[in-house]
Amino acid sequence: SECLVGSEMCIRDSIDRVLANPQWGYVIRGILDDNVPAGTEYKGIKVLGRIANLNIILPENRLDEIAITLGLSEYYRLEEIVALCEKSGVHTKFIPDYNKIIPTKPYTEDILGLPVINIRYVPLNNTFNALVKRAMDIAGSIVGIIVTSPLMLLMCAIIKLTSPGPLIYKQERVGLHNQTFRMYKFRSMEVQPESEEKKAWTVKNDPRVTPIGKFMRHTSIDELPQLFNILKGNMSLVGPRPERPFFVEKFREEIPRYMVKHQVRPGLTGWAQVNGYRGDTSIRKRIEYDLYYIENWSIGLDIKIIFLTFFKGFINKNAY
């Protein structure tokens, strides 16, 4: 059993979580809060008194531990409350109020005695993990280039014969650490001024798309030149899909946590794509899947995504 000490809103949030998860085994016996009258109840749990009365209230109640929960604006009181709790001799915990700031599972580390809370856990920040993934990208891209070279040569010939212009279309995208790079694709549209293409997505029955281009976009064959982006180190086999700078600037203001996707290399395929979020689909849902991938990366997850891509990721129903 425990006693919650702190501010009303944080205490209510903690009570709601404990009551919603009985498997945790916690039983809250009471609340100490300076801003709520003694005897007030919240979901059957009473306010026992003020925080200053902790040493008086504790002997009257059998408690295994005390949990301190304060709003960010009240952290100046933390030292005082910890001192009172320590005098009680009861095991004390601190529940930081950072849910609005840190929306996902954080992790802590010790830097020469200085405790540091990392806002987001990114496995690929680990040097060993990053090297393993890069080795997998190099090997995979080389194999991919060799295996698909007959198909790529065929596409080059068809594009050249059916539409005037370059074979490869190079477009600026935003990648790792917000750095821009030129992403390669087989040209699937009529040649147009760069100023016209920067700020518009392709739409259904877009007249700019060539006949062979429509087929390539639908089957994702137009993405094959990105194997060279992977070999160069601009991209990875698996990761969040990169976007154009104009849209990145737009989405960073509209979608919370959008920019987190740039903490890893963008991918040829990704967790969002194999779950159906490709092309003209919800950006917010794509970001949810991208964040899951970033925070839960493993070699096994990459292999799973590559496997799923072969079975359901190539055909893009939302490609125009």
Where in this protein do the model-derived segments appear?
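A short, structured surface patch at a secondary-structure boundary
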Residues: 202-265, 305-309, 313
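A hydrophobic, helix-centered structural microdomain
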Residues: 129-192, 229, 299, 304-320
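Short, glycine-rich, amphipathic interfacial segments at transmembrane boundaries or analogous
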Residues: 36-40, 96-101, 105-115, 169-208, ...
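A solvent-exposed beta-alpha-beta segment
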Residues: 1, 7-106
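Glycine-rich flexible loop motifs, especially short His-Gly-Gly/GGXG/HXGH segments used as catalytic or interaction
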Residues: 46, 50, 104-143, 167-170, ...
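Generic recognition of well-ordered alpha-helical segments
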Residues: 16, 49, 53-56, 80-83, ...
